[in-house]
């Protein structure tokens, strides 16, 4: 009633004038309202900012904010242009030419050119760099720069996925004249540039005003806070100390669903956690032991125990629903008698004692460790759990111990998701579980060289069948990626690749 009383007369005219002025100026006000600082919580410390050497999700986040790639993957899994505005391939798929977009600048002002691309690939190919994506780029035999904006790659064999792998995490294009500073003070061509990096505490980024996409990014700054404890993350986002919790601990989901100021944004992925059995160590040098462990694991129960139901059981990193998924292989109940038989054949009729290592700060993987201990009791494998701080886990456990829980993020293609892990020369295989199977090598090489979708699918169906009989480890599920986002954050969408695309995100 009070509002109606003052709707007319002099007061009404004043109100209408003020509203008109506000509407007239909203175009100039809106950008400043949408700018500001986005604060993100992540669980683990970053060891390096050199994209070729990155290995964990927190590092990948910075890769995509600070650096550009020749290509990128959209939310539908399609490869689209980034620094390269277009590309062509010869009929035999052995010669690929990428044409660089004009006006893409590095943060120090120089334009990205063909030699930067060549230098980037050379670093990845160099074993001394230690890049886990090296195996994907070993098929490049020769690189040429016909001019400053053209790069030509000649391959050792036909390969249809070259443009796809240039979208990957470690394949970010780096400036050839700033290589020495990449680990701690990198310069890229992405939407944000590094302001500061304090290991163990935070990464601060600021808008790159000369980013090649007009009007992007909207945010002035991004601050990535390292918060190992899930309780601290929860408190921070609920109070507004941070605006977004990346890769939300699943035990916190129900709590956040009750908060009207927070949105749970989720997306299915092909990201997986795995039970790693290192073939360089006994007893896992015997495939029968690895197979027995796999037979004893209840994957459907693992989804509930480790993920609280926010995932899907699977046999390999090819998720159910993918066109190449082998539907003839069913995910059933554990086969305890079959596992015991294999263990007896391998010389372990009474089972054995083993330590499994789990990383602190990765709660789903810690829950896997607990579940493994219980699931292996019926087959007389007695498991002791050792919890290891994340930094120590990366440096002293991963690839070095016999039995541990690890995890890996979605890759842009099936080939880049599988070949590095299962081929005997795969760069993840040789630093993870040291798996060797000549038949598997032939299958994966055939899939990589396939010229038709039908041929590629045939190879991957065979891959899944062989991985079931001779597993290097156990992949129990693929994960639903979840982020907790305050409602004043606009334009954010979770990525199936689990990176943060903040180019069009704003704060209201």
Regions found by a protein language model. Give the residues of each.
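Alpha-helical secondary-structure segments
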Residues: 39, 113-120, 148-154, 190-191, ...
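N-terminal lobe/hinge region of extracytoplasmic solute-binding protein
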Residues: 41-91, 122, 187-188
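A structural "hinge/loop" feature
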Residues: 44-60, 83-84, 110, 132-133, ...
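Aromatic- and charge-enriched surface segment that lines or borders ligand/interaction sites
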Residues: 85-130, 146, 152, 236, ...
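Surface-exposed binding/hinge segments that line
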Residues: 99, 133-176
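Ligand-site clamp/hinge motif
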Residues: 180, 210-255, 382
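Detector for C-terminal structural segments
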Residues: 198, 273, 296-324, 360, ...
